[in-house]
Amino acid sequence: MQPNDITFFQRFQDDILAGRKTITIRDESESHFKVGDILRVGRFEDEGYFCTIEVVGTSTVTLETLTEKHARQENMTLEELKHVIAGIYPDQTQFYVIDFKCL
């Protein structure tokens, strides 16, 4: 079985497959992805593969510079997005936005 290149919490799977979630915000450990990369996507909880994505953009962001656009791309409110990011990456300030599309 081929390993996944990136994982998402299972709760995001349906939004990704439906095209409602088109970005992911990660810490420095996942800042190496670049435009044009084709990635196998799995669930964080069980590593189960569920789709393939293409990276279509990358940028940097902080909690303070997150916008309503980022929130829409994550299919959340801005308040929800800030809460989720702070919960996943406590004590971090610099993040990496990966824009993607399902293939």
UniProtKB/Swiss-Prot annotation:
SMART domains: ASCH. Its EC number is 3.5.1.135. Keywords: Hydrolase. GO terms for molecular function: hydrolase activity, acting on carbon-nitrogen (but not peptide) bonds, in linear amidines; N4-acetylcytidine amidohydrolase activity. The active site is at K21 (proton acceptor), T24 (nucleophile), E74 (proton donor). The keyword Hydrolase applies. It catalyses: N(4)-acetylcytidine + H2O = cytidine + acetate + H(+); N(4)-acetyl-2'-deoxycytidine + H2O = 2'-deoxycytidine + acetate + H(+); N(4)-acetylcytosine + H2O = cytosine + acetate + H(+). InterPro entries: AC4CH (IPR008314), ASCH_domain (IPR007374), PUA-like_sf (IPR015947). Residues 6-94 form the ASCH domain. GO terms for cellular component: cytosol. The keyword tRNA processing does not apply. It holds the Pfam family ASCH. CDD domains: ASCH_yqfb_like. Catalyzes the hydrolysis of N(4)-acetylcytidine (ac4C). Belongs to the N(4)-acetylcytidine amidohydrolase family. PANTHER family: UCP029143 FAMILY PROTEIN (PTHR38088:SF2). This is N(4)-acetylcytidine amidohydrolase. It comes from Citrobacter koseri (strain ATCC BAA-895 / CDC 4225-83 / SGSC4696).
